[in-house]
Amino acid sequence: MSWRRGLVAVIVLVGLIALGVLLHRPLLRAAGQVLVVDEPPERTDAIVVVAGGTPTREEAAAALFREGGAPRVVVSRQLVSPRTQRLLEMGIRPLDFQGESVLALEKYGVPRAAIVTLDEPVAITETELRAVAAAARDRGWRRLTLVTTPFHARRVQLIWRRESGGAIEGRLAVVSDDCAPGDPWWRRRRCSEAVLHEYLGLLALYLRISSLMR
């Protein structure tokens, strides 16, 4: 009888392995798709370049601006690391992250007068969107376009709903990215790290411990 139980266990194990081989691709692809939010473009009061990924997000934001998507583009002041701050002070690096973002927007055709720079330094997406929401309330903006990467979009949407209190609409616009959700992203280290980072970020958001994961 023991050999029969062993045989059954082996058959079950082989079956599970075969099932995993057959289903891992659609499951992983679905895991990537869950993170993506991409909404049809509509005219809003401002286009927000969610910090990171310069100049890709700036290029997409500038394209929306040129198409009449909004009369202005908003750029946050991303906190720089001590190492980057030293490079700035030494003159080795001429611009901080916000300065690079502004210059990229200008290169892509956005007039400086149409670029709104926020002064408050922000370290994570939550504090960034909180600052954006505060700026929107102060200026009377009711609708914004939030530009980010595909895998970052779901978390941005959830954070925005929390920080805006539902009073200011935030529409997601995702950029073309080399980590496309439909591609086998799990075969590329950077893309795999991005997906893992987003799921950890969603968990931290749910547990309200994002400030501990800087």
Place the predicted regions along the sequence by residue.
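N-terminal type II signal-anchor transmembrane helix
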Residues: 1-38
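A structural signal for short, hydrophobic/glycine-enriched beta-strand patches
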Residues: 26-187
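A transmembrane-helix-recognition feature enriched in membrane-embedded lipid enzymes
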Residues: 188-214
